[in-house]
Amino acid sequence: MPIYQLDEGLWFPNPKYGEPDGLFAVGGDLSINRLLLAYSHGIFPWFAYQLCNEPHWYCPMDRFVIFPKEIHISHSMKQLMRQGKYHITMDNNFKGVINGCSKTDSRNTNMGAWLGPQMIRAYTQLHKMGIAHSIEVWEVKRTENEKQKTENGEGRSENVIPKSSRLVGGLYGIELNGAFFGESMFSLVPSASKLALIHLARHLEEKDYSFIDCQFETPHLLSMGGRHITYDEYMAMLNANAQRKK
């Protein structure tokens, strides 16, 4: 299959002619306009900057998504959520989340690493524009009274960083056309990224968003309710969402 070389023009070739893993183009840049064009067509960049100093563009024809209403919360996760050990916020520490993701499995240093300075700058700019968002998971020490409030469901949506807390996990991604495009997640303690994903799904369900784009299947995401759809089904939902917003 051909891999297209992009130039400075704002365009993408038809991704249906790409490699089986979704790679179909190399080059261009990580400008805001190009990234928005990419995501509106289900295209996302990986920047293997230690191997090639140009973005690699992917668009798998087999898409792995989670529909917010279908998020699976296991019994053990429900127990963890009732314990009050963790507090969830949104857009309170985007920098901390993306840096945490970049350090996971040496995503910023290994050969083929993709989450390096160029990617971080681009998504930080998208965050400042209100397009990229983060979910943060904080480990906190609560009083017995605060724990009781958590168990009763109180304060779950408080978007305030508690005192004596540390960032132990989270995720970030792009909100566009009624969908959330997950980019990366990290955990410093067991299940922190699962907590972030559950919170995200609940948030998106309230906003009537169609799906969370997980990019590729993993056992972790499969256990949370992820499933496969075709690229045509994927784009039909994105386009319908875009038309509904007009």
Where would I find each of the regions flagged by the language model?
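N-acyltransferase acceptor-side catalytic subdomain
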Residues: 1-246
